[in-house]
Regions:
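Two-component/phosphorelay signaling modules centered on CheY-like receiver
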Residues: 11-29, 118
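Acidic, metal-coordinating helix/loop segments flanking the phosphotransfer/catalytic sites
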Residues: 30-48
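Receiver (REC) domain active-site loop signature in two-component systems and cognate sites
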Residues: 55
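C-terminal output helix
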Residues: 106-115
Length: 119
């Protein structure tokens, strides 16, 4: 069973994605902010992470920088999912090492397709 970590501070988005990925036979983990995600990543090694950019405590960009430094996570794919939709925001996410950058509002179908493509 593939593992996915969803990192977002919006409860409705988290619930929707959690339901969708459980239905698609993923083991789902949830973090509400970047610091919680970093703490999770000390003990779980997901196949893929869906990561919001704008969150309290530690933002998505800083969280991704941490992920990229962790040798246990070298094969983990990261998709940014964010309301920050300027070209410069998208480019920053990709430059930091994200495998994809999707913008809100989003299509659940598109996210599932992107995840399946990456794993």
């Amino acid at each position: 069973m593939k593992k996915i970590l969803i990192v977002d501070d919006e409860p409705n988005i988290v619930m929707s994605l959690e339901y969708t990925f459980k239905k698609n036979n993923f083991e789902v983990f949830i973090a509400r902010d970047g610091q919680e995600a970093i703490d999770f990543l000390k003990s779980i090694y997901p196949d893929i992470i869906i990561l919001d950019v704008m969150m309290p405590m530690v933002d998505g960009y800083a969280t991704l920088e941490h992920i990229k430094k962790d040798k246990n996570l070298t094969h983990t794919k990261v998709i940014f999912l964010s309301a920050k939709n300027k070209e410069s925001d998208i480019q920053k996410g990709l430059d930091l090492g994200a495998d994809a950058y999707l913008t809100k509002p989003f299509s659940v179908k598109k996210i599932v397709e992107q995840v399946m493509e990456l794993i």
